[in-house]
Design a protein with these regions (language model features):
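C-terminal "cap" of GNAT-fold acetyltransferases
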Residues: 122-134
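Conserved beta-strand in the GNAT
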Residues: 29, 35-45
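Short loop/turn motifs at secondary-structure junctions and domain boundaries
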Residues: 19-24
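Conserved active-site alpha-helix within GNAT-family acetyltransferase domains
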Residues: 100-118, 126
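Conserved acyl-donor/pantetheine-binding loop and adjacent beta-alpha core of acyl/acetyltransferases
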Residues: 41-75
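Conserved GNAT acetyl-CoA-binding A-motif
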Residues: 89-101
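Conserved GNAT-fold acetyl-CoA-binding loop/helix
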Residues: 1-17
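Conserved acetyl-CoA-binding loop-helix of GNAT-fold acetyltransferases
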Residues: 72-89, 106-111
Length: 134
């Protein structure tokens, strides 16, 4: 949770949520020589929390994939860039969101070609900065 001291609290992401990601085939691990150094969910299709945005998405007409729950063990740099590169082989239109306090993730998203589009609210009602790459 480097740079992410307030976004992942109170047991988030829960074991149940991660199990759902696995069951749907949406959870991916990044490993080298059998050692996991990163994890993320990649979900293709409409994200209900992205339906309402204070701002505007750049493209509402083409299918997109969303990167969620990206985490690393802190031993490598470029974990987000690696996840984005992989996701782009599946779909060229990507979205992501992060907490306003997670400046590290905001910078990484910008470097990975994402543009900040506005603010969305996640299921519990808290705001997140919304990003899109097309």
């Amino acid at each position: 949770t480097n740079g992410n001291t307030v976004q992942w609290v109170n047991g988030y992401p829960s074991e149940a949520l991660l199990r759902q990601d696995v069951a749907r085939g949406d959870l991916y691990v990044m490993e080298e020589d059998g050692v996991v150094y990163g994890v993320f969910a990649f979900i293709i299709g409409d994200d209900p929390t992205y339906q309402t945005i204070h701002g505007a998405w750049r493209d509402n007409d083409t299918p997109y994939g969303t990167l969620h729950r990206l985490g690393s063990d802190g031993t490598r740099r470029g974990v987000l860039a690696e996840a984005v590169d992989w996701a782009l082989t599946r779909l060229p239109h990507l979205r992501a969101d992060t907490h306003e306090a997670n400046v590290t993730m905001q910078r990484c998203l910008g470097r990975a070609g994402f543009v900040r589009c506005g603010v969305i609210r996640i299921a519990d009602g808290t705001p997140r900065l919304a990003y899109e790459r097309i």
